[in-house]
């Protein structure tokens, strides 16, 4: 979908968001609609089934859409950073020019060299003559000597000139601008990207390849093979040994008709890969974005993040935080209980000072 077409729905979606009040409930509305009105959550278990998705395909589809806009957001961040660096660079250049101009105005004008006539008596072929000695000769010789003396300094000065960045980091910057090679690379027969837990490999296919039965994909824990079926057999598009192990049970592939075979590989360990295949030119993992995507956070970590976010907003508004609300709820239950000395009195949360460490979540 084009960006302009997607923006046509902004007003309707904005109305929903304003009505529910937060992103979490907004997403519940969207996925609830998919659950009630579509076959999005229906599993395609048999070849004869005409509705639904294969196991894991719907989740992979959602993750792919998230990654697309996550890449766009990272590109926006990178663009803003580059614009800021460009402004700083221009400002520094202008300041340097101003300082140079001021220094040039204060620099003293050199005194012109004058001819000096020296009388000397020299025996040359038995004759005496007065020679007119002019400094230009010696001056040139001294100048030549000074050039030789200044040569080491010139070399040292040249060493201070910033060199161009190495080719590899510059290439990685280009990879980062492409969602298909974000945190990965573009190779001759395929393109790959990665996040904290998964890798995505795109293997281009000809336009006439539009059905899954026209390709063959074989995945093992340590290897990958992608081939295209032809009349005379198979044409291998990508094949090799993986640089790290993958989880084949949660890895899957699909065909984008006439475009590419899309292979999603699930990492066994949570670490960054510098290459997909052994023998492939490695990328510099120090030049990639190592921030962990929210999509890779499990439910327990997500709950903690949600609680911290809630507490932050409550604190800004001067309202009770989650640990205080939990204790208040417990106190309210016993406030008016039979035999309570506080029964009949108004419950005032301000009477209690509760530290965060006093509550277990």
UniProtKB/Swiss-Prot annotation:
GO cellular component: cytoplasm; cytoplasmic dynein complex
Gene3D superfamilies: 2.60.40.790
One GO term (biological process): protein localization to pericentriolar material
Pfam families: CS, Nudc_N
Keyword terms, alphabetized: Phosphoprotein
GO MF annotations, alphabetized: unfolded protein binding
Basic and acidic residues bias spans: 87-97
Alphabetical list of InterPro entries matching this protein: CS_dom (IPR007052), HSP20-like_chaperone (IPR008978), NudC_fam (IPR037898), NudC_N_dom (IPR025934), p23_NUDCD3 (IPR037905)
Residues recorded as bearing Phosphoserine in the entry: 146, 340, 355
Segments for region (Disordered): 87-106, 124-158
Composition-biased stretches (Low complexity): 148-158
Domain CS: residue ranges: 185-277
Record-given protein name: NudC domain-containing protein 3
Organism annotation: Homo sapiens (Human)
